Structure formats: C-alpha cells, structure tokens
Amino acid sequence: MKTSLFKSLYFQVLTAIAIGILLGHFYPELGAQMKPLGDAFVKLIKMIIAPVIFCTVVTGIAGMESMKAVGRTGAVALLYFEVVSTIALIIGLIIVNVMQPGAGMNVDPSTLDAKAVAIYAEQAKDQGIVAFLLDVIPGSVIGAFASGNILQVLLFAVLFGFALHRLGSKGQLIFNVIESFSQVIFGIINMIMRLAPIGAFGAMAFTIGKYGVGTLIQLGQLIICFYITCILFVVVVLGSIARATGFNIFKFIRYIREELLIVLGTSSSESALPRMLDKMEKLGCRKSVVGLVIPTGYSFNLDGTSIYLTMAAVFIAQATNTHMDIFHQITLLVVLLLSSKGAAGVTGSGFIVLAATISAVGHLPIAGLALILGIDRFMSEARALTNLIGNGVATVVVAKWVKELDHKKLDDTLNNRVPDSKTQGLSS
C-alpha cells in the first residue's frame, strides 16, 4: 500500500522548505528567529550518530566469516575515495579557471574585513595532517561517544568488532545484545525523523531571513558556477561510475530523495547519516560494507566539499587579482589532497578547511575569505547534497568490488519491484 502524499516525509520536508523560504523572505526578522528549530533537529541527529555507527560496524564485522574481508573492504574504500575525490578537486579547478567567476571584481584585500574571518583562521591552525591523524585516536572511549567524533567512534567500533569476532561463540550473547540495541536505536531514529520538516523549516527560514536573497545576487556568479559544477560531477562522473557498476544514478537519487531533502534543509550531509546506513543495507549492500564505507566517507570522500575548496580558493585569487600560475595551482591541489580529508560532513567545516588551505599555500590573501563568508551558507547545500550522493555511490561500488552486493536486490529496489525472498542472495 502506497503512503499518502501528505503523509510522506518527502512531501512534508519539501513543503516545509518552501514555507521557510517564504517566511525568511517576507518576514526576515521572524525567519532569523527560527534558527533554534533547525539547530535542535541537527542536535537530535548528532545525538544518535555515535551509537548507530557503533552498532552497525560491530555487528557487521563480528558477523563476518573472515577478518581478511574487513581489511580488503577498507583498502578498496580508501582507494576509491582517493581517486574520486582527486577527480572532484581537478574538475573544480578546471571549471573555475574556464568560467572565471571572480574575474573583474578587482577587490583590494586590504579593504576587506579580516576580523570577520579571524575565528576561522584561528581554528584552521589546528588542521594539520598530523593533528588530524592523532585526533582519530580518542583520549577515552566515553569521550569519543560524548563528543560524537565519527572517526574516533569508528576506530573503537572496528577494534571492538575484531575482538568480539575472535571470541567466537563466547561472544554470541554480547553480539545479540548489540544487535537488539541497534533495533532500538533505529526505532529512535524513526521518531526523530518525524521532526525533519520542522528542522528543515527552521534552518531554511533562518538562512533566508539572516542573509537575504540579495546576498545571492551579489556574488551569484560563484554560486551558479559551483552549482553547475556539482550537477555536472553528479551526472557525468558519478553517473558514469554508477553505470559501470550496473545501476542508474537518477534512480538512485530518487531512492534517497527523502535523505536529500533533509540535507537540503539542514545543509549538513551528517543529518542523513543514520538513515543512509539503513537504506544502503536495504539496497543490497552487506551490513559490514555499509558500516565501514559510509562513516569513513564522511571524512575521506566529500566530493562536494572537494569541488568547493578548489573553486573558492581560485575565486579568491581571481577576485583579488592574485596571480596563480600552474605551479601555484598544482601546489594548491597537493595541499587540498591532504587538507580536504579533514572536512567532516557538518555545516561550516568546509570553510574552516578552506582557511587552513589558504594559510598552508601562503600565496593567497587570508582576508579574501571575507568575500565568500556571506555566501558560504548558500553553497553548503550543494556541497552536502553532492557529498551524500557520492558516499551512497561509493558504498555500492565498494560492495560490488568486494563481492558483497546483492545485484538482484539492488535492481529490484531501484526499480520499485518487490524482491523475491526465495532468490535473494549475494551475487558477484
């Protein structure tokens, strides 16, 4: 039985976003006051992310027959992440050089308000690769869960899963408890998701109310250029990868449309993480693969953020008439290959990584960040949407490469067919 249109989350979130835009535009002060609604929803999601990752990864790893399979999955995932995110960086670099959205602005860096970006520049000092790697190791297990640090929780979950697997039958009781706890957690997620329309409404009303449509027009060339690039990346690059893997990118986007709308409303791909874990498993990817690829992808496979970083950096150079020859752009690319891996899928993190990159390159004026500070919030939607689609595609690709993908289930689900339980099973 199909769900009524008015009861579907897709329709409710879309309607809430539209109402939020109207409120923010016609009553900006009231719209700006709706911010707590969006913040509250995102906090509710973050509250549940750590236990979701822990349960999914532990039960996935502990339930595998061979530990070699886990290592193979991790290696394949990291290889895929590196290749595709590098392609995203290069595409962003090429298109921003061709379209030149910042050309002709002739901005003097000394006239920009450096104080406006001082807080981001300060946070960027801690974005070194060594500091990033050390931060993956939690000071305490409780601290990792309390702070909601995805990679720290993931590391502990992987170790816990390995240890539980080695216990064999002795660990069966613990395995059953965690699996039951996982069902409770996903029950909580279903309750939280009923509030998604309210969260999307509040976040969108605040964005339009605070920054206004005028901000979009002021620096619209960069925004348009960025959105076009993200669309091209999803359709051409991810579309080609999907086709080579055996599925249609547009059918996949339709399958995760509710998650995309939640991300559109909150501007954070992290807000859809719990539901993506569940949906990718229902799509035919084995639980162990989903549990490793999705959480890891939130730091190592942010395609939208990669595009944003190269385009924003070169845009600042163009707008301030800072010459960037091929050597400077290659240096920028190399630095971004490292710094982009620390950009978690939360609102604002991409801007901090951009500040870190500009500081590391040294050739660009740090005050130039003030140029895009006001419109960064509007570009975060495209970043987050591209990140989410990219991680979903990555999960299917990795699952196929390690022969942990149910092809029939994938095909049936994307084509809205009810899978035949008698014929379900892994196929290579």
Swiss-Prot record:
KW Amino-acid biosynthesis (keyword) present: no
Cellular compartment(s): Cell inner membrane
Transmembrane residue ranges: 8-28, 44-64, 76-96, 142-162, 184-204, 222-242, 326-346, 352-372
Top-rank taxon, per record: Bacteria
PROSITE patterns listed in its UniProt record: NA_DICARBOXYL_SYMP_1 (PS00713), NA_DICARBOXYL_SYMP_2 (PS00714)
GO CC annotation, single: plasma membrane
Any single biological process term in GO: L-aspartate transmembrane transport
Topology of the protein relative to the lipid bilayer: Multi-pass membrane protein
A GO molecular function held by the record: succinate transmembrane transporter activity
Keywords assigned by UniProt, alphabetized: Cell inner membrane, Cell membrane, Membrane, Symport, Transmembrane, Transmembrane helix, Transport
Family: Belongs to the dicarboxylate/amino acid:cation symporter (DAACS) (TC 2.A.23) family.
Cited function: Responsible for the transport of dicarboxylates such as succinate, fumarate, and malate from the periplasm across the membrane.
PANTHER family: AEROBIC C4-DICARBOXYLATE TRANSPORT PROTEIN, PROTON/GLUTAMATE-ASPARTATE SYMPORTER
Name of this chain's protein: C4-dicarboxylate transport protein
Source organism per UniProt: Enterobacter sp. (strain 638)
